[in-house]
Amino acid sequence: MKKLLIGASALVILIIITLISYNIVQANNPVTEKTSLISIQKEIDKKISTYGYTFDNPNIILNPYEISPLTALIAFETKSPEIITITIKGKDKLTTYSHTFDKTDKHYIPVYGLYPNYNNEIIIKSETKEKVINIKTEPLPEDFILPTNITKKEEYLTNELYFYTPSSKGYTCAYDTNGDVRWYLTKNFIWEISRLKNGHLLLSTDSLVNYPYYTTGLFEIDLLGKIYYEYLIDGGYHHDYYEMENGNLLVLSNNLSDGTVEDYIVEIDRKNGNIVNTIDLTTILPQEEGKSANSTEYDWFHNNSIWYDENTNQILLSGRHQDIVVSLDYTTKKINYIIGDPTNWSSEYQKYFLTPTNNLEWQYASHAAKILPNGDISLFDNGVNRSKEEKNYLKAENNYSRGVIYRVDKENMTITQIYQYGKERGSSYYSPYISDMDYLNDGHYLIHSGGISYKNGQILNVPASLGEADTLKSITTEILNNEVIFEIELPTNNYRSEKMPLYQKDNYHPTEGITLGSFNKTETSKNQVPLIKYKKENDTYNKYNIVIEKETNRLAITGTFSKNDKVKIILDKFLGKKTYDFIISTRPYTAMCVDTFNNNKEEKLTLTKYINNTTLNGKYSIYIYINGTVYKTNYYVNF
């Protein structure tokens, strides 16, 4: 018995020594933790106060959330509830903006539309007095894009602004009718830009779940840059969303585990961030039919827009790589009809294609399909190749893009073209990718040809980044009753443009931002790597420029590699080793709609592997396997 106790004690001591020695071997430096924007803004919110400030001596904070330089916040208290009106003086009537806020005794007045590098004059009025405030702003960044040409008929214009999200170099921003910059963000928030019913904007986050542009989700923000909600989406967000009548969001996403992209839609419950419905287009449409020249096995549909019509319970999707716009019943997920050239589609699907009734031209590689108030359908017809048959392809220099409106007769399965603009402008208006058309009112449209590009004076038939363009252009045209009343030309490519007022239901709320939604568990490798033999960081390791950061809900490992490199990430803790594949490749994209995240301009690839913290717990040492060698980094991560 005594021997057994001694033996057991020795075993316990051995285990303790093993654990201590293991921890000594494993103990390194903690990885750098990247503070999220939500966390940064929580600290800012704590410092914003009305207490002790009055109408005559207000608290004035320029760029309060540090990402929207042409905004400010004026905070003060009044003895009794009052209505406050603010006016931002412009250079003329069309560029002067006013807004009246709800009655209260604690006033948080957001100031939008400041000029850059300017001593702006702001007039605030209470019910009993008036005060002038001057706010001096900093110059624009040196790389800011300014218009090269403005055409306007002022008698038809309103004092709204033209908002943009970039596709290439540039900023998410807004220009007034003079072409002056009146708002911009310093963060890379992209894709669709429009107002929610509550007046907030919904833009992408500035982090990726996957190359080249699938962001972690969406930020609901105001023009100050304050984030109210972050919606995390495991498959990422791209291109477009739609706010439903019940407040839920229909979002274009991916099912990254099935080997294809841009063919998956999720409905997000705004109250909790949960996904309450999904649509997988691989179960609805054939992947091998109706292919355009840009179709790939990976990106076979390339869904670039979504619209929901509550009256008919249909969703409208634009598939660039099948040259179709498809209407689905949202409940049954069955096809209602397909708009597009039926060439190269089987008899099984021919029954869904609408029959033209007049001299209709089909759309090719379209974007931004929408259902108008009267049931008509508008879209931007990019027009790539203008045929499904290679022998009939139209060259870019002979091609054109246009805004189009179609009228669909569902009962007779026919379609009529009732409006177009852009064809008359020829190749100078030709955008082979991105772009937009917005219905402003009957006979009043905003048509945005956002992806015009040239190389050596020749107009390109591919996205600017894929064609190594040396000249970029976007043209946004406002049309009223067939007359161009405004046009702005910018020397860059812009994904979308929206005409919107500066203020819309803008009651600032000093509440902390909330993150909703979650990421799934990151799949581990089928091939494990033993840690019996490893090297410390050395010159060979350092040439890969490895950067390791911990984000709020995941680990990010970035490095610069060659396409043939074999890389794995190993997270190791006692009795808990995890190995993850780091795939060093990029897919052959034929539609690089947004190039703002792309750092891979050279032969080597700078890529990031994300490991979600779901199911991970405790302290892990970080090893990196590269081409047969295991490197023990100097870092650990704690989940």
Residue positions per predicted region:
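Short beta-strand segments within Ig-like beta-sandwich modules, predominantly Fibronectin type-III
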Residues: S98-T104
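Histidine-/acidic-rich catalytic cores in large beta-rich domains
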Residues: E33, I38, T54-I84, I88, ...
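Extracellular/oxidizing-compartment recognition motifs
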Residues: K93-Y97
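N-terminal Sec-pathway targeting helices
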Residues: M1-I13
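Transition segment at domain starts
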Residues: E43-T50
